[in-house]
């Protein structure tokens, strides 16, 4: 590593020269850095806006799932079976699916060796269970904080290697040399003078592990503080893929946490409170049959994400009813674990569907109030909220229908390299998932992508530019950064208000319920803001410049994602996945408003992906066919020969 302070067009900029850089300190970021180091690329650094920020460190659920190849029991499984299953969820590139499947076991075993306590039976088998969108029992878990444990174990190993860390650095621009990455610029969030504000990283192998676009919504399960950097990549010319495909689900508002699994299976009471303080048990108002209502709540535990296929008569009607109470009737919505639905002293368990009854019976939980059943079935799920200041024995839990995961993201190849040479994207920032994905598959994908990217970089290393050329290459981008600072610096600040306003509108127009006409008008609104941002956005000090650049990235991401949704809607495509597109035709759930009328997609576009390109305040879109699942395998001697020559890394 070489560090110098340069004058670039009269601006003072710190420069750092590296062979490779990882941006992001979550599970995927740490894994990428470790894989680079273990592949003998040691002139590296990890850059993060906050070492303890990020989704993988700060999220979980009642039993957070990690998805991997089956390693228990007598049911057949294979790399290709797993790849085919991942591919089958629609709009998935087969080479990514095969790579995620083939890397599943080595990445999982690595985590076990690093100390993540995935359970085994007395014979050493890694026991599994079936999760959502899982045809087998590939799921496993280390408890409510699986991804946090992963991150901490990876961090401990990372720190043992003495790899450099630049903390408090926000990615603001990617520098290009033609169609290749030449470096990137960060903002020092602690800087209080212009000459310490920006750092130019002279590096042509960049692994972006900055997570999903967490900052574009208000109702979000993503941890506060994590916003993502996809807008920075879009601005540099990185292509987006499957940007319409998200997961939305019920989650608590404070703290931000999925209320999946046991939180639903213990059959809590759903309550909304209107402006006069009156309580409404709105599920009981909608369902004519109490047994069907309770069974739907139970199913919501393992059918957690909102699924448009289950919106008419399935468990996802609950998501829509919560949405109506919160977003249309402007009521706050709560889960009450202190009282049974209908305020019953004892529930009529015989009214439950067989699956729900048998599950609760096997768990010895056919008794008491929801909190009693929770303590019986999964007391750590209670302890988790208690550790965050919420006692479910004493208070209700506010919830909403929240953005939880972006299945799309930056388009990458089979080595997780974007269309910008040298820019690799791993973790949720990468768009390797499709319309659906199994629960926990994102954690596997993050580890697999990190390993693949690091391996490719180690075999095709792009050495950094000579510093003088690097400075010249970055000149326009450096000036752009300083010009933005000059434009938004003022004697007052409106950053907070602008962020809240736009994220609330994103919830309303570009969330789980999407009206094509409203999408288009919202897209135009964001575009106008972007074009005039330097006049609209104001901050009163350099200390707030961190938020100013975050809002800039947020608006770019909001525009590109909303434009993608609007493009999808205008093409005549229909409702699929975790979003409902309002239509004049089709069906709607019984007794709900016309905004919930939709036409279900029949899968005719499952073998296509929609690609987005952002440039100069415009979004262009094109469709390409998915890459099929490769045959893989091969004649051993031939594969071995190639492996000895080039590691089969090409």
Question: Language-model segments: which ranges?
Answer:
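Core beta-strand elements of the Rossmann-like FAD/NAD(P) dinucleotide-binding domain
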Residues: 15-18, 193-205, 419
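Glycine-rich loop(s) and the adjacent beta-strand/alpha-helix scaffold that form part
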Residues: 205-259, 440-456
